[in-house]
Amino acid sequence: MSIDPASATAVPHDSPQVGGDRLDRPVLLVAGVVVLGGIMSILDITVVSVALETFQREFDATSAQVAWTMTGYTLALASVIPLTGWAADRFGTKRLYLLAVLLFTLGSMLCAAASSLEMLVGFRVLQGLGGGMLMPLGMTILTRAAGPSRVGRVMAVLGIPMLLGPIFGPILGGALIDSASWHWIFLINLPIGIIALAYAWKVLPGDRVEPSETFDWLGMLLLSPGLAAFLYGISSIPDAKQSEGTIWTLQVVAPAVAGALLIAAFVPWALSGRNRHPLIDLRLFQSRTLTVAVIAMALFAIAFFGASLLFPLYFQQVRGEDALGAGLILAPQGIGAMLTMPVAGVLADRIGPGKIVLTGIAVITAGMAMFTQLTADTSYAFILGALFVMGLGMGATMMPIMSSALGTLEPHTIARGSTLMNIVQQVAASVGTAVFAVLLTNGILDIAADPTTDPVGYVAGLADSFATVFLVATVMVGLVLVPAYLLPRRRPAAPVDPTAMVGH
């Protein structure tokens, strides 16, 4: 019988908490550093997505070729995330965070100076190596600084870039490209990166390192290329479906199967008694709370990131909006999330994340269900209202799930736990994007195959295809209610190790 770390280390609710219940100035300063890093890495993904057409014109390339500016970044992200937990314990989170910001900022500067598509892809990989470390490191730093009793509130702070980046990124990207040039979608990272470096150097405390811990070389050789290959195969599915009419192409199957086999081979090695320090500690799944949180995060990420693909496409392909207009229409979703996120963080710390996540998922499901009624001329008032409702739910979902997982861990396992959660989120997001893109492509191909369809009928059929895919998204979000019901419904009370952030 396994023992949840939360139960093993629980203390009475009236026990003194490290740092008190309020987010004091040192924690808020640390949170500011982490938010800056998160804004850079997450905004960059969505800002670049609106520049793909510009890259095609600038470099005289095909859509498949310029897609490598996104794919290269994603593969670098997948390769470096598994190493982050070990590197944080080995070298310290402050040193590694500074390195991550430096790599990302340097990569941004080089991307802006790229004179060919090949150079741009290479520099995007450098960006991805830095960006892949920023979010798991941010979770580790904030959780250690605040302690379990305040993890909900600090996760709400970290959720600002995670939830708002996909919404406001297209707005920023469209504005920069229209008013200046594509170079500025990268140059805008330079002042943020320089400020983040100086800020992190000043306010991040030194932390304990484990110089005696050995590196899991075999684990790295199995997991990092395994994740990269699997995600490459999955991300190739939409293109294969559109160009070949099937997902069972060599471009999809070969990397996806090879990656899955490498990941599967990593599991017994990680659990082996000979492996004292696995790259990703799968023994963390002995915690029931973490296991449930991982399942909830996977289901939610599939639905959320998959649906995030649909919104701008509907506005552009059905309603004729440009990239900037589509981004502006999505703003109510961000406003709703901003309203509930800080409240959800406080309540998660007071009454446990379980009730908060249940409420959030129910609200998102209601908002998503409204999109199953989409037509080619659905009123914008209805759409904006549905987006606002979804935003209210999102602010009460993603970060409470994260806090429920990390709040049960001992200080020395937080880095590995945050790395695990980020891997799950990255894989699930890629799967969700691919699945929803294929479902939408199927609908579009069916409409295009009908020779009797006139332009008006095509647009109406296209809107129906979006509504059908939103029905799948609604069901997927609703399924999150099952693991959410099993999340903790009482205040986390595990003490944080006061030496966890002592400088050396």
Regions found by a protein language model. Name each.
Residues 44, 73-80, 130, 161-165, ...:
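MFS transmembrane alpha-helix packing/gate-lining sites
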Residues 37, 157-161, 215-218, 296, ...:
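Hydrophobic alpha-helical segments of secondary membrane carriers
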Residues 26-83, 119-120, 181, 218, ...:
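Transmembrane core module of solute transporters
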Residues 1-38, 42, 284, 289, ...:
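Transmembrane-helix exit segments and adjacent C-terminal regions of multi-pass membrane proteins
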Residues 3, 178-295, 321, 329, ...:
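Hydrophobic transmembrane-helix bundles of small-molecule transporters
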Residues 55-56, 87-88, 172-180, 234, ...:
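Interfacial helix-cap and linker-helix signal at transmembrane-aqueous boundaries
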Residues 81-223, 236, 377, 411:
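Helix-loop-helix hairpins in multi-pass membrane proteins, especially solute transporters
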